[in-house]
Amino acid sequence: MSLPEGALLFVYTGDGSKVLGGYGAQNISHSGTIATQPIETDDVVIEVQAPAGSSPTLRLSEVNHGIRPLNLRATFGSNFGRASSALTCTPEVVCMPGLDEMKRAVVVVVINGEGVGSGTMVSTTEGGNTPYLLTAAHVLSVNFKYMNIEQQAERTVAIFNYESPSCSGEVMPDLTQSVSGATVVGFDKPTDACLIRLNNVPPESYRPYYMGWTAEKHPGGNYINLHHPYAMTKRVNYYNGNVKVNVTCETDQHYFDDHMHYEVPAWDVGTTAPGSSGSPLIDRAQRVMGGLSAGKSYCSVKSADYFFSLANVWEQKREATENIVRALSPRGSGTLTCDGRDPYGSLRSRARRITHVSSALSGDSLSGQGAQLSSEVILGDADAVGEHYLLKPHTQLYGAYVMLDMSQVKPNELGSEDVSMTLEVYTGGESPAATIPVDLSKIIRGTLSSRQDNLKYREVFVSFPQPIELSDRGELILAIPTQSLPKGVSILHQQYSGAGGQMMIKSGNKWTPRTLTKGTIALWMDPLIGDSEEDQAERSYPLFSLTSTSPEQILLQLADRVSETAELGIYTISGQKVYTATLPSRATILDRRMLEGLGVVVIHVTAGSEQLSIKALFPAN
């Protein structure tokens, strides 16, 4: 297969109700193949859309048809927007601060269209951009059912950034950021460790991160697990105790050697599920210790999960384990730790997504932030609508995320023709610096078919063919001509006084701010920008943050810069002491019930020379 610049490949059901893609040239492996995730259908259409005059080539080499459904409670998109009750205790990663780098390393792993797990992009002691992916051996072999592991690796798809942009999980994320095909580096059944090398380096627009690792036997306490349960959006678990080492993984089938695993006795926040296998156990230093092999944890039942141990991989002297060690630590097994790195960190800038919509950081539903206005109200009689950003001069733009509301689309008015919209990028001039067509046909039809699962909101990622540089003024408007939006499709937005963004409307050649009587509107259109080293140094984060993880629990997280213990004090507004404690870790679970009914309380944290107080309201029930 070969795809010219601008060409896209789609795979969809005969009725267009389920869609995979579009896949571009960046998704093709070195061997010229694209492996796709499974799609539930008995008839399938493979379509290539290419610019006029180009010459794409396509050969269908193999189709795998399963006669039994996948052993998954959810596949991509199903159950989206109403997370299974089995997952209510494991939060969406966007809800939790401090995970910016780590979450970019964790991917969905799809094996030959049949098996699904999680994996982690990992760094090496020599640096470089080699795309090593750490997962579990039982993931690559689909529970050791298929031992032709080289073929399994070649048919592997790694999907990046599959995470909801909203805490409420109402927006289905883009699924096109994938890399297909890999080569086996080391596959070790006794430990369950598996390292593969992707056939292509993830492009910069994917914002990949290669996480550090540790082969130390007893790394420090306070652990994180990032995972894709049931192949759903990325979630996070926390454990504040100490893991058990050299335990025997308890499974129905005795796959692994005894005394090879870490045991997490019970998560303080979270649970795992099918699809979480291979996901990383991460220590306080943000290094991978191993990957999930098996578990018994549930939200309703606190029980153990088991992770293969890189420390035990380092101690084995088999060919497979030595290949893993040699790849991650070319100088030999004497090196036991490696820091994480951004593979594009040596460039002038790194890709970073920014947004004006605060609901991305809230546990409230989008409707709770202010009901979505109709397309007619938002668009009015304007020629175009856009979201205005004022950034640093000469900032580089790599792409944009647009969140669309498809709840008002009527299938009988859609027709059979292709449906598209246009994204325009203004950098200060009267004319757009770039005009990019965006095909929505498959996305809209796929969303409509899944409306029973509340998939009415959809994230669309638009990758720019070439980076766009802002002018000396640093002005940016991401815009959509109103006539290009399909009937019934609107742009997700936030409307209330004090919203962080600024919607603009264009009439003729003039842009003016759009406001309501109650305040401003922010269109949910997020640029992907180059974040320079200076920008990263200038960004500051609060000393701590609070996140409600359940009706009974609150997660208090300290900033990464805190390297010592911190002191916590909680007081009523009149100064009465409610609770004090020493915080030995960056993540601490507080019992929300001790605060209910107290009204306004002051939560105060001191760490070294820094201190911060936050007021919070806990009304009586």
Describe these PLM feature segments.
Residues 35-54, 468-480:
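Noncatalytic modules at the cell exterior or secretory-pathway interfaces
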Residues 39-265:
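Serine endopeptidase catalytic core focused on the charge-relay Asp
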Residues 119, 556, 596-621:
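C-terminal tail/sorting-segment detector
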Residues 120-130, 270-292:
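Catalytic nucleophile loop of clan PA
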Residues 126, 131, 284-287, 570-578, ...:
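Short, glycine-anchored, charge-dense loop/turn motifs used at functional sites
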Residues 269-270, 278, 410-501:
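Aromatic- and Gly/Pro-enriched, solvent-exposed loop/edge beta-strand patches characteristic
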Residues 338-429, 481-531:
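Beta-sheet-rich sandwich/jelly-roll-like modules and their strand-loop junctions
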Residues 398-399, 535-570, 587-596:
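Glycine-centered coil/turn sites that cap beta-strands in beta-rich domains
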